[in-house]
Regions:
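Secretory-pathway/membrane protein signature
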Residues: 1-128
């Protein structure tokens, strides 16, 4: 699996209207990190950046020793940072169509850029 994954996204906490949050991969310099930071920089007004040490969702498994996948998280409110998290208030009234739509747009931009990212390789020796 590891050899086939060039960039991964842990999609979590994407439905509210609060500020976008970014949690990098363990190394912070993978293609997923660069891509996510680029999209957030140019398509979101404000972003709260976290350290990988602030992890707490499934990225713990994806980036754990021996697994080491290039996975990042783009969230709205980061888990554990809002009072509704894991309470009865963390329900459908907390999320909105607008919040989900903007998150969808951001992830779609990431995938679009990723699909257009090419590395060209010459098939001839010397100059063509």
């Amino acid at each position: 699996m590891k050899k086939n994954i060039i960039a991964g996204f842990n999609v979590t906490c994407v439905g509210d209207n609060k500020t976008f949050s970014f949690l990098p991969s363990k190394y912070g310099s993978t293609l997923a990190d660069k891509l996510a930071k680029h999209v957030l920089k140019y398509h979101v007004d404000k972003v709260k950046y976290y350290s990988f040490l602030d992890r707490g969702s499934d990225e713990r498994q994806y980036c754990s020793p021996g697994v080491d996948l290039p996975v990042v998280s783009i969230m709205r409110s980061k888990y554990g940072t809002y009072r509704e998290y894991h309470t009865s208030l963390d329900n459908m009234s907390f999320i909105s169509a607008k919040g989900l739509e903007k998150s969808y747009q951001i992830y779609t931009k990431c995938v679009d850029i990723l699909e257009k990212n090419k590395k060209y390789k010459s098939t001839t020796k010397c100059e063509p």
